[in-house]
Amino acid sequence: MNLVGHARRRESAITAPDRISLHRVSPHRVSPHRPKTVVVGAGVIGLGIAWRLAKAGCAVTVYDRGAAGHGASWAAAGMLAAAVETEPGEETLLGLTLESQRLWPDFAREVEAASGIGVGYRDEGTIVVALTRDDAEQLRFTYEFQKGLGLAIEWVSGAEARRREPHLRPGVSAAVLSPYDHQVENRALARALAMAAQRAGATIHEHCPVRELEIGGGQVRGVVTAQGRDPADVVVLAAGAWSREIAGIPAPYLPPVRPIKGQMLALRMDPAAPLLRHVVWLPRGYLVPRRDGRLVVGGTVEERGFDDTVTAGGLLALIEGAWRAVPAIEELPVAETWVGFRPGSRDDAPMLGPSGIDGLVVATGHHRNGILLTPVTAQAISSYVLSGRVPDSLRPFSPDRFGSPRPAEAVFSPAAQ
């Protein structure tokens, strides 16, 4: 359940999360035939798009209301769980998540090479555990549904689950193994994408929110920030849960995105003797082990707007759910707690592609799949900006699918720039 949006953290002295450093880079050649592009939002989605476009020769400027990568891209758990997160009604989304999952190994290597920063890609896989008979019945139902979609998952006994993860509670009754649902260190990914984008020639402005989108004659003209006006041929709206907060966009064209609050915490394991190797999905929540010894515990799902309060009840639910599966966590120190906001759409699928306003491109609403969908979103949105053709993979996720009065195809054509 990845949180793409805003994060507010409470940290103990035991953890001091790395900050993303923005560096001046040598000038890169910008093609006069490429559209000048502004990306609104410096989360992993916006940074991935900016990197791809800058590599292709576009002049790219990224604006963010906070620090680059420090919204809920920072708050996410980094799970790449295309299989085990698929629920009934999400069959269309599955095609996109599987495609992005397939891209991830090469994408991780490419980002690392471009940035010089490791992204912590791990391929041990995911285990979903059932702790009671009722849990096992629900897990069997979900397993049969996912298996019926052709997903590469395996039903295993509780004993086999404990063989793979000895610190699981002895009473684990059954489990599902998903070997291709991997993980990435999302905070490192955000740092790496910011660096890669800058090295490719993009400019990133932190703590500089876009106040207004300038539109004239049905066409994007640029954006207005605290620093002034920035003309642009294309504006990519990738502001997560804040994608409706920008003035100047006519109401029918605002993406129907809302914040979905998630509370999370991290425990501190001994890196030399971690309690877990796999990502472990619980009946209520999940555990994600990091190589640095952090054990990420998540996450609540709350319709509370932009309330960024960490609550006793939220933490209790997370810790109790984790303890029921892995009792050994009770001696671990709490390293950090935080809140993030997933950008949810009406159908919990992303909104990707032309908005109906010439030059305004939407890339938001990724809900719990923002980290997973970063490679395919960056690839498809940059392809559209450069070619003017909507990739087939994006058509089911058009921003106009909710019935807003906008054309199915945008009139934007890079060839006309």
Which residues does each predicted region cover?
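Helix-loop-beta segment of a Rossmann-like dinucleotide-binding subdomain
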Residues: 117-130, 142, 149, 154-200, ...
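Extreme N-terminal leader/targeting segments of oxidoreductases
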Residues: 1-37, 55
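Helical element adjacent to the flavin cofactor pocket in flavoenzyme catalytic cores
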Residues: 176-226, 230
